From Swiss-Prot:
Pathway: Carbohydrate metabolism; tricarboxylic acid cycle; succinate from succinyl-CoA (ligase route): step 1/1. Belongs to the succinate/malate CoA ligase alpha subunit family. This is Succinate--CoA ligase [ADP-forming] subunit alpha. The keyword Ligase applies. Succinyl-CoA synthetase functions in the citric acid cycle (TCA), coupling the hydrolysis of succinyl-CoA to the synthesis of either ATP or GTP and thus represents the only step of substrate-level phosphorylation in the TCA. The alpha subunit of the enzyme binds the substrates coenzyme A and phosphate, while succinate binding and nucleotide specificity is provided by the beta subunit.
Amino acid sequence: MVLRDKMILLDENTKAIVQGITGRQGSFHTKKMLECGTKIVGGVTPGKGGQNVHGVPVFDTVKEAVKETDANASVIFVPAPFAKDAVFEAIDAGIELIVVITEHIPVHDTMEFVNYAEDVGVKIIGPNTPGIASPKVGKLGIIPMEVLKEGSVGMVSRSGTLTYEIAHQIKKAGFGVSTCVGIGGDPIVGLRYKEVLDLFEKDDETEAIVMIGEIGGGAEEEAAKFIEKMKKPVIGYIAGQSAPEGKRMGHAGAIVEKGKGTAESKMKALEEAGAYVAKNISDIPKLLAGILGK
């Protein structure tokens, strides 16, 4: 078997810092990331420089952390009111990939840092995301590695817990995951479905893709236009098939307005684009078996 040295987003060359490492969530998830082999080379909390968290050195600024560790990625566990500044600081320090776990970030703040990142060519995952995970390399974020097994299925989702459930079903059926990407449940996010699908399309380790969508917005319809041009098989599943109009379901992005963003319209768009559409979660492993011939 060829050793994989380059996967999508997260690979053997990823060296990450954790912004907000001394907080409860930051500290807890730093330990989890280290346990699965992720290279966490530093942490940042202003005023806490010089400390250690699980053996990881803490710095006062991202600039200082990057200078000392050559970090190229950051995971952000900073509270919502300070998240925008944390992202800007990471971008200005030369970080190339930023995973924003924080939820409840004001939409205008997100728009500002997403636009800034796009202007300078920095990849942002999130906000309000479980992050990314590659069983062979580790994870940036909070995805529980227990649900993942190494394999050739790429996963991309707007939901967190639903991703874990589907990953677990895929594992139980004997299949594994190349990379799992949570794009985030907010109305505005950094990398969208189509960008992640494009990365999977070019990834040698990925043979098939499972895309988990949900009601609200037009992200899945936008993805469907890209799926039309893809060579690799895509299985689509849309959560919220019984959701009433006008009611927000879980995520800020999950709301059906005036007949737009319904599960029905999304499933139709995916089907017309040539994707395999799973009506239930239990259909996903069956469809994978048909596609991958196992």
